[in-house]
């Protein structure tokens, strides 16, 4: 067994390589390094066996059993493995799983190949994560969080992108030095420190009119963030402060309701407004983010959080696809939640909103929601769950960083007595 420090390209990311009497297995980390191990009878290896190999190789404490899990991850699908799952056989069924749980074309499925990834356990509660002090654990959590930021899954306040880029620069580029760190250095590396939607140039007539700002605004703000945090650690050895910096990065993300979530491909219907005839598509492509505290919906085109609802305010139900000869129907998840709404007369009333979220992965979404809620119920009754989950997060904390954008979704409204207000 050896630890691979080099980065891997997508073509090199192969989980299993068969040998005459054994199986070569590669387990990847979110920092693009991997652990390569040769196993006798590797075809029969369970996720729990491979998990222990990672703990040993990385020098992680046994308590990490709750913090991390093994996943099969590809551009099309992400699956958390249970302890008794056998990854080799899961990979053999990958085309079938992608056909069932994604809307990908046959050639996309044929070209898709999963990697075995060691990453955060979706059932590990954020309330327990904030107490972690072990540097190696924080490092792994940091790299996964950074991945989610750069992939555009974690939608943040604009100023925080620069702060996080400054922390990342201090960790990877060392302290700011005016001789070495010039504006061109930052401009050439934007894609490694920011999600695309932050630095990409808008297109179209309306976009050009909105983007009348200094061209170097992002580079300059990143440079300033790097310089500022470097000044804070001016007299410190950065290598001795890495654990503190990993934690500092994570602290900016913990308040967001989607932190630590599993992300599912989905879409919702657009509301039909006065200019509805101009819209080319009636759907909004979304991420549905589900964690131990609630459900979030993220607009993937506009990179904004549309909805964040804690389980304390949520009801849900699976909807079978309504097959139509001329329509490729999708299963869906019905999300029902309470909101305060003002009538045209200015009177505030309590109503129920229902949103349909369409996804090939709807059954997986429902299963994850119900598993998270069931674990919380067991804990409240004093019964330890298989994956330990802390108590409910308060609804105010869940909403702290996000404002629900109800007007941007196609919602059905009911009164508390059950009357449909859309009719």
Model regions: which residues?
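N-terminal recruitment modules of adaptor/scaffold proteins
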Residues: 2-14, 19-34, 147, 153-156, ...
């Amino acid at each position: 067994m050896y630890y691979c420090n080099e980065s891997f390209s997508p073509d090199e990311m192969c989980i299993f390589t068969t040998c005459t009497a054994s199986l070569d297995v590669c387990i990847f980390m979110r920092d693009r390094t991997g652990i390569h191990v040769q196993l006798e009878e590797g075809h029969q290896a369970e996720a729990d066996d491979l998990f222990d190999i990672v703990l040993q190789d990385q020098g992680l404490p046994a308590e990490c059993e709750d913090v991390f899990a093994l996943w099969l991850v590809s551009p099309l699908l992400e699956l958390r493995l249970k302890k008794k799952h056998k990854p080799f056989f899961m990979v053999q069924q990958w085309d079938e799983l992608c056909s069932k749980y994604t809307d990908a074309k046959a050639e996309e499925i044929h070209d898709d190949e999963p990697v075995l990834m060691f990453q955060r356990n979706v059932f590990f509660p954020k309330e327990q994560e904030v107490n972690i002090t072990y540097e190696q654990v924080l490092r792994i959590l940091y790299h996964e969080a950074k991945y989610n930021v750069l992939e555009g899954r974690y939608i943040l306040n604009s100023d925080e992108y620069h702060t996080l880029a400054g922390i990342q620069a201090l960790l990877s580029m060392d302290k700011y030095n005016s001789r070495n760190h010039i504006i061109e250095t930052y401009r050439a590396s934007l894609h490694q420190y920011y999600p695309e939607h932050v630095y990409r140039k808008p297109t179209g007539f309306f976009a050009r009119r909105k983007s009348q700002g200094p061209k170097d605004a992002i580079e300059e703000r990143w440079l300033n963030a790097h310089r500022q945090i470097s000044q804070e650690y001016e007299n410190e050895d950065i290598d001795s402060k890495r654990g503190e910096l990993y934690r500092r990065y994570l602290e900016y993300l913990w308040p967001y309701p989607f932190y630590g979530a599993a992300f599912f491909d989905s879409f919702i219907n657009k509301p039909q407004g006065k200019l509805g005839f101009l819209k080319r598509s009636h759907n909004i492509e979304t991420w549905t983010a589900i964690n131990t505290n609630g459900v979030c919906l993220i607009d993937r085109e506009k990179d904004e959080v549309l909805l964040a609802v804690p389980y304390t305010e949520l009801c849900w139900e699976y909807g079978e696809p309504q097959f139509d000869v001329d329509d490729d129907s999708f299963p869906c998840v019905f999300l029902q939640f309470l909101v305060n709404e003002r009538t045209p007369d200015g009177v505030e009333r309590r109503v129920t909103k229902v949103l349909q979220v369409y996804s090939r992965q709807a059954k997986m979404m429902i299963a994850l929601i119900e598993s998270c809620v069931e674990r919380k119920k067991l804990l409240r009754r004093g019964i330890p769950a298989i994956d330990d989950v802390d108590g409910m997060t308060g609804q105010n904390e869940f909403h702290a960083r996000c404002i629900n954008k109800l007007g941007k979704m196609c919602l059905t409204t009911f009164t508390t007595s059950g009357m449909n207000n859309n009719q």
